[in-house]
Amino acid sequence: MGTRLKVLRVFKDLHRTRRDVFRDDNRALTAARVKINEEFKKNKNETSDDNIKEMLKMARAVETILRESVIQAEHVDENKIVLRPRKSLLLENVPYCDAPSKKT
C-alpha cells in the first residue's frame, strides 16, 4: 500500500475513533478534530519515508490509546460524576488465580 494511502487511512481511522470515543460531547469532538487536522496539516509537506513511518506509528498509537483507554464522564451534580464506558471497554469478570501454575 502506498504511503499516501496509509496516511489517509490513519487520518480517517483517527476521526472515526474520535467520533466514537467523544460521542455526544461537542466540545471534545471539536477539540479532537482541530488537533488531528492541525497535526496532519503541519506535516503535509514531509517527504522523508522514515519520518512518515514514525508519524504513522505515533498516529496508530494515539488511535489505540483513544479507543482502549478513554472513558467519558459527565458531571450530573456538584459531587457526582457519571461514567459512560463504551461496550468495547467493558470486560467480563475473569477468574483470578493466585497460585502459580505447575509446569509439566
UniProtKB/Swiss-Prot annotation:
CDD domains: Complex1_LYR_LYRM7. GO terms for cellular component: mitochondrial matrix. Disulfide bonds: none annotated. It is found in: Mitochondrion matrix. It holds the Pfam family Complex1_LYR. The keyword Chaperone applies. Coiled coil: none annotated. Belongs to the complex I LYR family. PANTHER family: COMPLEX III ASSEMBLY FACTOR LYRM7. This is Complex III assembly factor LYRM7. It comes from Danio rerio.
